[in-house]
């Protein structure tokens, strides 16, 4: 990389750190081009990205954005995975790492909190934001449907009693 290209590359990484509240740092040594392409495609469908970074430039970008605590994670063949939705991204990366031993999760950041590999795996087990919204809506609707059922029950049971009494006579 030319010296004149380095500030532009650092600025790209700084923008990723600023615009994405969640970043996972990985080692990708041994992944084939087709495996990386497959990972990128699956991430793209979830509005996430995968970027191979130079460690020194990633450290500089981390220092410029106040993320000094992750600078020590950049060693070896490093790539960052970034997204605005941490749970979906973590699920994709963890599942891909299970299927491909050459992708190693090193750590990451979610909302300025540094996570280790274990924490990212635990994050991937959580329901996504959309799943949580669906559960909340379901919980809010459940009492209303129960109230309607309770209100309708006396009138329907009263109608059955009258019908039974009428059929006897």
Curated annotation (Swiss-Prot):
It comes from the Bacteria. SUPFAM superfamilies: Ribosomal protein L10-like. GO terms for biological process: translation. Keywords: Ribonucleoprotein, Ribosomal protein, RNA-binding, rRNA-binding. It holds the Pfam family Ribosomal_L10. InterPro entries: Ribosomal_uL10, Ribosomal_uL10-like_sf, Ribosomal_uL10_bac, Ribosomal_uL10_bac_type, Ribosomal_uL10_CS_bac. This is Large ribosomal subunit protein uL10. Belongs to the universal ribosomal protein uL10 family. CDD domains: Ribosomal_L10. One of its GO terms (cellular component) is large ribosomal subunit. Part of the ribosomal stalk of the 50S ribosomal subunit. The N-terminus interacts with L11 and the large rRNA to form the base of the stalk. The C-terminus forms an elongated spine to which L12 dimers bind in a sequential fashion forming a multimeric L10(L12)X complex. The gene is rplJ. PANTHER family: 39S RIBOSOMAL PROTEIN L10, MITOCHONDRIAL. Forms part of the ribosomal stalk, playing a central role in the interaction of the ribosome with GTP-bound translation factors. One of its GO terms (molecular function) is structural constituent of ribosome.
